[in-house]
């Protein structure tokens, strides 16, 4: 498939936060399609394209660890934002993290590795001379050189993601999952956010089959809002 890319990613820790956990972060069992898309976009993205995640290969056993992380205690208040808008100045619209830092517990993933299989689609912002092949080749060149617009991360910025492009003719890295770990119902998982319709989250039933999660299309019937 000429329009396909496969990217091997790995890291010491990861946290793909479940939205239903309000106070302390708890990670999903594996990377979400939206987080995978974010990693690809950190390497190459333009308004002309969207990355579509097709498959996620889970290469290492799912292991959790409890840690404590420094987080900002509160968001900037709505009244401060409204005041800045009225004044037409953002001079006072800031927060000092040293004054509002809190330690919070988090349940994160340890020693993770995946292969992201994805393709690109053109958006309405694409120029007449643009096509998916052009952007796929740009992505491959950047990934081979280790280039990125910003450091890809495993859910949160303090957990960097290392990456390596897998050529179309190269085999996938060997999975370290045991026989009993290859097939597993992972429950409902965030697919992505529909930014064009009120930032609505979409969810799908994630199932690990032979170590692979098949990601349905964003507007498929099995994807729920």
Curated annotation (Swiss-Prot):
Manner of cofactor binding, per the entry note: Does not require a metal cofactor.
GO molecular function: endonuclease activity; RNA binding
Keywords carried by this UniProt record: Antiviral defense, Endonuclease, Hydrolase, Nuclease, RNA-binding
GO biological process, one term: maintenance of CRISPR repeat elements
Top-level EC class: hydrolase
Assigned EC number: 3.1.-.-
Superkingdom assignment: Bacteria
Pfam families: Cas_Cas5d
Similarity remark: Belongs to the CRISPR-associated protein Cas5 family. Subtype I-C/Dvulg subfamily.
Free-text function comment from the UniProt entry: CRISPR (clustered regularly interspaced short palindromic repeat) is an adaptive immune system that provides protection against mobile genetic elements (viruses, transposable elements and conjugative plasmids). CRISPR clusters contain spacers, sequences complementary to antecedent mobile elements, and target invading nucleic acids. CRISPR clusters are transcribed and processed into CRISPR RNA (crRNA). This protein is a sequence-specific endonuclease that cleaves pre-crRNA at G21 into mature crRNA.
Protein's UniProt name: CRISPR pre-crRNA endoribonuclease Cas5d
Organism in which the protein naturally occurs: Mannheimia succiniciproducens (strain KCTC 0769BP / MBEL55E)
